[in-house]
């Protein structure tokens, strides 16, 4: 199975560097060379060959071999190579997919919105794919499908291999296939020949004329070059350390961990069904209910056996390198040094023909071949010849490598870091050393032109054509690849900058003001060095500005306007510093600042420029982003039109492209956190303490909030217009007999008089609507009434009442606050509250009225507090997909448009709701972690590199313990440092001496100014923490002693700072002064706090058990800090067509068409594989949905196979303890049980429960679900006492979170009764079953099937209990038995009944339905669809009325754009990329054959 590859791998395999858009470190690419194709060994989902879009590639390789930067055709070639992925089985994708957004919020598109989202896609740039799906037009898909061809491959020393390939694959794919197979994996330098003609690596198979079914392709060994020899040695090293997890722990080469196969002890699909009596089901102690603090060691199981056998002691380059002149002329390329496991030492020569042992020793150089000489083309063959131990070990490594699941061997798209790691052995590794010191990015200097032109690559990929599906796949694949490489390079560069390994471009300036260029990427540390942010919050504003800028880049990229370009942007937090990495605009370093900017302002609005081309491009983007074009006055009092915020700068690069940067104010300001004189808060907000003065003035509203706000206003607009029209029609009917003049005047006057009252009524109605949810029948009636009213109005409009219709729309617009009088128009002016900007105020009531624009921004901020926060809390009261940690809570808040700065308000609301106790606890923990992060960043900036581990361990001791926290630095040393006056100079980024900048050269000065422009002239990529609340040293005077400041921190002082920070930033009063009181009051575990904090700031601690209660010695020592890693934020490229297929598939599922839905989602997965490769978060979401559908369709085996892949993928791309991983484990356990793997099912549940308790403790609704599952399976295995412990805990949690009369509680009582009856405790069983019966009766009525089942159960239990009691009484009265005691009838439940109950617990209910039921369900669906259609008709009708009204008044403006704006108000209308599914939630699948309960 050949897998899609990129041209980086092509270079590694063949030396043909053509067509590459670039590559990651070759260490990674060679590692993946032997891993790539494995990903395709198993059919991903449905056996259909995944489509390839390599048609556009053609033979680009040789043409572009020497081009740098790569041009468009080169990128097409790379993308083409990457996309090609078909054998007979489904090609899963690229093992070297280089980037993904780890922060990508995989949001749940609610199933009932799926259809709407799919329909609304027609308003987006992606309409083509959605329309193709909807219309059933498969032309694009047909273009991707191709025929298979079977060829034979003959390699030296192995049997002929027969493989089936796609005719659209490149020859390069066969190289990758051979480098992955066990028998040929050690070959790297070879060519492929057909009829003695060498095949072009970048030719498609279908273009090779002699190639036909059954042709034999020969593998021919080629002579080595210096580069090929180095690649071969690196490949051998990667093969030997293939099983070693060290790279995954060190965060290298996109390797990551997975423990599924460790837990299941092999592939689940290979296991036989187990008999219940043969299962070892005893849970580990740390999994049983009541555990106080879960241990840390089980997080990484079976570490000791992970490494695999050692084949060599040393493999390194020799110190005799490079070969001297005479030896070069004899063909010597390089020398290697090897120590075998037998302790024999060899010096090896690499020449053009291969490898041989020479006669050199450590002291004498003798390059002649050893006697007897043995020349091997492969280094593996030579080492096997000289060392029997190597031969045995290599065979064992290969065997274990091929036994691993394909997904374990594929590189992840993005580096996942571990927050804990074992003590790793540091071995001799010359290649690792070379990567660290010799080269800029591994082997990237081997790409033509050496360093890559990142900006050219990023922009060229965006310019690729996108008209057809194959073109779009090529384009998105290329964008994803280049973006991933850029993120990797930016991350390495940022770490190098902070570690002091990069020279500044302005070395003479103060360290805080320095900027850097490395590998064609511009880096800036963030401090407010030139007082750009003095009025906006100084360093605090400078710290958050890069993050807001990144949000702006994300949304403009999502809109994807042709001709408008953004910079590649990555924000990296590392060692307490924030670094922003950006691609460089061509020519920016050659020009002065003032010459560069042609649009926007470089001084916050004092001087403002505009440009017609920018206005045109930004107006297009603004329609999607709801940005209002507005005019401001420049320094000469001339009006200047803008279609963005004034800070947004436009620069035309030397390449002629129009770039925008500094997008930090893309969205309107949040007035709830700004103290403004001209803003009057509403009474509700004033009572809640708003406005709160934030520490910076860059607070913006989120795009999700604006969409929700516009949608809410649009619904109100429709309702008001319909009510007016209905009343108008009724009045007209009543006034038929009156003269015409009166009849037209009266309604208008009366309506005008009623308007204020109607507004009040509308408000009351909305409040009522929030207080109690409407039933579906009421909604249907009101929808029908609205439709009828508008239909009548339409017919009346057509006759003579255009004026009245216009009046109706006008009133509705006025009521909801539309910017235009006669159209629904909601757009926002991002500059409306910006200080120092002089706006041109339009006439009152018009769209340019400043008062109206301000009111709109205020209303949106008020909507957030009064509507969105309550809606967020209400949504979580059902506990259907509850957040598990701070990250999932943050994602959920963001999906509702709620910024994290509102966390204090959210916590206060949650604190009043006992049923939301778990969410309150998670929110408090997140609050503490974020406050501590602010303090930690300043703390780290004032720490010498020499004392980093001591400082971090001291900080963790202060945060997590109350015992002794003596810092591991002598008091003498501290005293010396405090005496020094220049103590602040130890860390070059913390220097803040007052005017010590030395005179610098003019070239340095000009490059610095130009770089400042590249950064928008603001140097906003700032890196000073918000930790001033801690009172830590951040001023120049304080920096003198700052190097020793960390030693002065104590647990008491740190927690005081945390309390101050939570009050200052979130306006929330923490009621604790130590970790002990905090844990006791709020109920979180210290291990959970440790995990959350390490992940938040990038600390890796040693994997061992920590005693947080220790009173005699510090919990953390220097050696417990293993590493610090970067926390990286960047955008996530989209797969638009895959998303459209996915949403259409969801819509089909909602209609009960499971098979059609399955096929569409399978196709979505194929497209995702094409764009992202085999490993990506969204692929995992697709797999989970497909597994669930397979299960619902009755194919439990297929569900197990797919879900196993979903688990491995989640562990590798999200993390081994990520909330999504826990969800995947619970799903897999259900499918394992359904396939008869009872023991495995329990092990998977134990793992899920352990991870859940580690993250958030036992008090969580998800723990109740897992405990119910464990209890039921233990019950089936006859472990009644264990089962009872778990179900009692589940019952306790269910009662707490769902209430005493909830269905969850009824099920828990029933399970307890079943278990107790099996134990012979009929009295308790009877009592519990009575509770079940009582709940069923009150909730569903006496005649419901569940109530009747419970009644029957009660009858049987009563009978057994009475019989037993009678015999017991007999014994007590007579002292002996008068008759034989009959045995207690305990019949263990059948596996079928247990599975049925498991399905019920997990929300899956299979319903056997008749034809009559099908008809009934179909009519319900049609009614639901009719309601949706009615809503669309309302929209269309209103547009008609507005158009008629405008025509009547000779209006010149069309309503098309405004109508589109209104229609696009709903989420999913195309403004933002909506990801596939909720990473941490349950998909609901309500269909005619299967329903999912809450």
Swiss-Prot record:
Record PTM Phosphoserine, positions in chain? 278
- Amino acid composition bias (Basic residues), ranges on this chain: 57-66, 977-992
Q: Which UniProt keywords apply?
A: Cytoplasm, Phosphoprotein, Repeat, TPR repeat
Q: Does the keyword Protein transport apply?
A: no
Kindly list the GO molecular function terms attached to this UniProt entry. mRNA binding; ribosome binding
Swiss-Prot/TrEMBL TPR repeat ranges: 1138-1171, 1264-1297, 1299-1332
| Entry GO CC | cytosol
Q: Where is the composition biased (Low complexity)?
A: 32-56, 993-1044, 1460-1472, 1483-1494
| Subcellular locations according to the entry | Cytoplasm
The family database entries (CDD domains) matched by this protein are listed as: CLU-central
Entry-linked Pfam families: CLU, CLU_N, eIF3_p135, GSKIP_dom, TPR_10, TPR_12
Positions of the UniProt region annotated as Disordered: 1-79, 272-295, 733-783, 969-1044, 1450-1494
Q: Record's superkingdom?
A: Eukaryota
Task: Establish whether keyword Repeat is in the entry.
Answer: yes
- Please give a single GO biological process term from the UniProt record: ribosome localization
Locate the Clu domain: which residues?
Answer: 432-674
Please list the residue ranges that the record marks as compositionally biased, kind Basic and acidic residues. Answer: 733-772
Similarity annotation: Belongs to the CLU family.
Q: What does this protein do?
A: mRNA-binding protein involved in proper cytoplasmic distribution of mitochondria.
Record HAMAP family:
CLU
Tell me the protein's name.
Answer: Protein clueless
Q: Which organism is it from?
A: Drosophila grimshawi (Hawaiian fruit fly)
């Amino acid at each position: 199975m050949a897998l899609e590859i990129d041209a980086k791998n092509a270079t590694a395999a063949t030396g043909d560097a053509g067509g590459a858009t670039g590559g990651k470190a070759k260490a990674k690419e060679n590692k993946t060379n032997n891993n790539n194709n494995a990903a395709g060994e198993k059919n991903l989902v449905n056996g259909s060959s995944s489509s390839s879009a390599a048609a556009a590639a053609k033979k680009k390789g040789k043409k572009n071999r020497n081009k740098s930067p790569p041009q468009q055709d080169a990128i097409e070639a790379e993308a083409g190579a990457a996309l090609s992925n078909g054998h007979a089985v489904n090609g899963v994708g690229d093992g070297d997919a280089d980037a993904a957004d780890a922060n990508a919020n995989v949001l749940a598109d609610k199933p009932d919105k799926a259809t709407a989202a799919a329909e609304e896609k027609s308003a987006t740039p992606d309409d083509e794919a959605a329309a193709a799906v909807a219309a059933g037009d498969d032309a694009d898909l047909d273009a991707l499908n191709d025929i298979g061809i079977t060829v034979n491959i003959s390699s030296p020393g192995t049997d002929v291999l027969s493989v089936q390939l796609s005719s659209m694959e490149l020859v390069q794919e066969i190289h990758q296939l051979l480098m992955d197979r066990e028998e040929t994996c050690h070959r790297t330098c070879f060519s492929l020949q057909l009829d003695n003609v060498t095949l072009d690596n970048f030719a498609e198979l279908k273009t090779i004329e002699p190639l036909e079914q059954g042709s034999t392709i020969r593998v021919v060994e080629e002579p080595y070059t210096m580069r090929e020899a180095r690649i071969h040695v690196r490949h051998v090293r990667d093969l030997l350390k293939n099983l070693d997890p060290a790279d995954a722990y060190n965060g290298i080469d996109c390797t990551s961990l997975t423990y599924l196969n460790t837990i299941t002890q092999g592939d689940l699909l290979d296991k036989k069904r187990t008999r219940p009596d043969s299962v070892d089901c005893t849970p580990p102690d740390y999994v049983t209910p009541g555990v106080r603090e879960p241990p840390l060691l089980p997080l990484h199981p079976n570490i000791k056996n992970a490494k695999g056998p050692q084949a060599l002691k040393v493999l390194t380059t020799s110190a005799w390198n490079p070969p001297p002149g005479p030896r070069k002329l004899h063909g010597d390329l390089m020398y290697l040094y090897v120590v075998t496991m037998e302790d024999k030492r060899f010096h090896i020569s690499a020449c053009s023909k291969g490898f041989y042992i020479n006669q050199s020793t450590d002291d004498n150089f003798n390059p002649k071949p050893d006697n007897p000489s043995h020349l091997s083309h492969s280094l593996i063959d030579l080492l096997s010849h000289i060392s029997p131990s190597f031969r045995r070990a290599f065979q064992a490594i290969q065997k274990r490598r091929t036994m691993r699941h394909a997904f374990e061997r594929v590189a992840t798209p993005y580096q996942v870091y571990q927050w804990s790691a074992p003590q790793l052995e540091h071995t001799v590794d010359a290649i690792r050393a070379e990567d660290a010191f010799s080269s800029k990015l591994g082997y990237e200097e081997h790409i033509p032109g050496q360093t890559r032109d990142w900006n050219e690559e990023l922009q060229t990929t965006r310019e690729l054509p996108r008209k057809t599906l194959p073109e779009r796949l090529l384009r998105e694949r290329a964008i994803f690849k280049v973006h991933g490489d850029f993120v990797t390079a930016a991350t390495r560069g940022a770490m190098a900058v902070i570690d002091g390994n990069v020279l500044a471009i302005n070395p003479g300036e103060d360290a805080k003001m320095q900027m850097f260029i490395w590998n064609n990427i511009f880096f800036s540390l963030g401090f407010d060095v030139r007082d750009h942010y003095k009025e906006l919050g100084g360093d605090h504003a400078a710290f958050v500005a890069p993050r807001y800028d990144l949000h702006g880049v994300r949304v403009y990229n999502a809109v994807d306007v042709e001709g408008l370009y953004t910079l590649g942007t990555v924000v990296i937090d590392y060692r307490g510093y924030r670094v922003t990495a950006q691609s460089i605009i061509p020519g920016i370093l050659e020009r002065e600042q003032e010459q560069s900017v042609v649009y926007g302002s470089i001084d916050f609005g004092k001087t403002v420029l505009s440009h017609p081309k920018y206005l045109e491009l930004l107006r297009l983007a603004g329609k999607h982003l709801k940005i209002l074009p507005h005019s401001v006055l420049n320094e000469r009092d001339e009006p200047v039109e803008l279609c963005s915020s004034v800070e947004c700068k436009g620069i035309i690069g030397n390449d002629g492209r129009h770039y925008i940067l500094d997008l930090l104010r893309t969205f309107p300001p949040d007035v709830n956190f700004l103290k403004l004189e001209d803003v009057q808060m509403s009474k509700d907000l004033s009572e809640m303490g708003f406005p709160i003065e934030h520490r910076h003035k860059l607070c913006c509203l989120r795009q999700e909030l604006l969409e929700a706000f516009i949608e809410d206003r649009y619904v109100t607009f429709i309702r008001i217009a319909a009510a007016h029209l209905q009343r108008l029609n009724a009045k007209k009917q009543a006034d038929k007999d009156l003269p015409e003049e009166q009849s037209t005047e009266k309604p208008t006057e009366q309506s005008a008089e009623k308007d204020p009252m109607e507004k009040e009524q509308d408000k009351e109605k909305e409040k009522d609507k929030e207080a109690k949810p409407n039933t579906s029948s009421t909604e249907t009636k009101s929808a029908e009434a609205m439709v009828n009213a508008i239909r009548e109005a339409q017919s009346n409009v057509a006759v003579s009442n255009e004026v009245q219709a216009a009046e109706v729309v006008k009133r509705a617009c006025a009521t909801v606050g539309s910017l235009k009088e006669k159209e629904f128009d909601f757009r926002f002016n991002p500059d409306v509250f910006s200080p120092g900007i002089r706006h041109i105020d339009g006439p009152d009531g018009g769209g340019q009225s400043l008062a109206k624009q301000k009111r709109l921004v205020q209303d949106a901020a008020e909507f957030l507090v009064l509507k969105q926060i309550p809606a967020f809390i209400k949504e979580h009261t059902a506990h259907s997909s509850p957040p598990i940690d701070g990250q999932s809570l943050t994602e959920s808040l963001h999906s509702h448009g709620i910024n994290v700065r509102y966390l204090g308000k959210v916590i206060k609301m949650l604190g009043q709701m006992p049923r939301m106790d778990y969410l309150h606890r998670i929110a408090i923990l997140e609050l503490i972690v974020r406050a501590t992060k602010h303090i930690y960043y300043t703390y780290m900036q004032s720490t010498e590199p020499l004392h980093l581990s001591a400082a971090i361990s001291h900080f963790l001791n202060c945060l997590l313990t109350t015992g002794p926290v003596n810092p591991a630095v002598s008091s003498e040393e501290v005293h010396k440092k405090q005496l020094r006056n220049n103590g602040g100079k130890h860390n070059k980024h913390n220097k803040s001496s007052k005017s010590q900048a030395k005179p610098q050269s003019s070239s340095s000065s000009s490059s610095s100014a130009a770089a400042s422009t590249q950064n928008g002239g603001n140097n906003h990529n700032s890196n000073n923490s918000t930790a001033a609340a801690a009172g830590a040293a951040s001023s120049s005077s304080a920096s003198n002693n700052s190097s020793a400041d960390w030693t002065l921190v104590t647990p008491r002082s740190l927690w005081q700072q945390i309390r101050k920070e939570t009050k200052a930033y979130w306006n929330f009063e923490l009621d604790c002064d130590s970790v002990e009181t905090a844990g006791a009051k709020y109920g979180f575990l210290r291990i959970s706090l440790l995990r959350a904090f390490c992940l938040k700031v990038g600390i890796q601690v040693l994997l061992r058990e920590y005693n947080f209660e220790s009173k005699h010695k510090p919990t953390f020592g220097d050696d417990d800090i293993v590493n610090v890693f970067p926390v990286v934020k960047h955008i996530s490229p989209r797969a638009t067509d895959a998303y459209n297929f996915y949403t259409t598939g969801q819509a089909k599922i909602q209609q009960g068409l499971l098979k059609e839905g399955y096929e569409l989602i399978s196709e979505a997965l194929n497209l995702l594989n094409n764009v992202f490769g085999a490993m990506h978060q969204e692929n995992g979401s697709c797999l989970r949905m497909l597994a669930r559908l397979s299960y619902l369709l009755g194919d439990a085996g297929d569900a197990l196979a797919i879900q196993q892949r979903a688990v491995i993928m989640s562990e590798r791309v999200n993390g081994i303890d990520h909330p999504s991983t826990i969800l995947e484990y619970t799903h897999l356990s259900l499918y394992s049980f359904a396939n008869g793997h009872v023991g495995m099912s329990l092990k998977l549940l134990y793992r899920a429960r352990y991870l859940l308790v580690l993250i958030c403790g036992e008090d969580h609704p998800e723990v109740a679900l897992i405990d119910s599952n464990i209890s039921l399976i233990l019950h089936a295995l006859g472990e009644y006492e264990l089962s009872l412990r778990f179900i009692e805990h589940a019952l306790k949690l269910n009662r707490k979170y769902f209430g005493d009369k909830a269905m969850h509680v009824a099920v828990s009582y029933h399970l307890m009764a079943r278990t107790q009856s099996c134990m012979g405790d009929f009295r308790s069983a009877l009592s519990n079953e009575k509770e079940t019966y009582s709940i069923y009766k009150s909730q569903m009525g006496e005649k419901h099937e569940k109530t009747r089942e419970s009644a029957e159960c009660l009858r049987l239990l009563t009978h057994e209990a009475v019989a037993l009691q009678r015999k017991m009484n007999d014994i007590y009265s007579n002292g002996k038995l008068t008759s034989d005691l009959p045995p207690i009838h305990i019949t263990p439940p059948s596996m079928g009944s247990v599975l049925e109950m498991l399905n019920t617990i997990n929300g899956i209910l299979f319903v056997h339905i008749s034809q009559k039921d099908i008809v009934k369900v179909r009519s319900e669906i049609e009614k639901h669809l009719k309601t949706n259609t009615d809503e669309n008709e309302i929209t269309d009708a209103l547009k008609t009325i507005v158009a008629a009204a405008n025509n009547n008044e000779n209006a010149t403006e069309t309503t098309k754009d405004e109508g589109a704006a209104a229609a696009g108000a709903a989420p999913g209308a195309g403004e933002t990329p909506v990801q596939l599914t909720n990473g941490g939630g349950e998909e609901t699948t309500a269909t005619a054959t299967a329903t999912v309960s809450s």
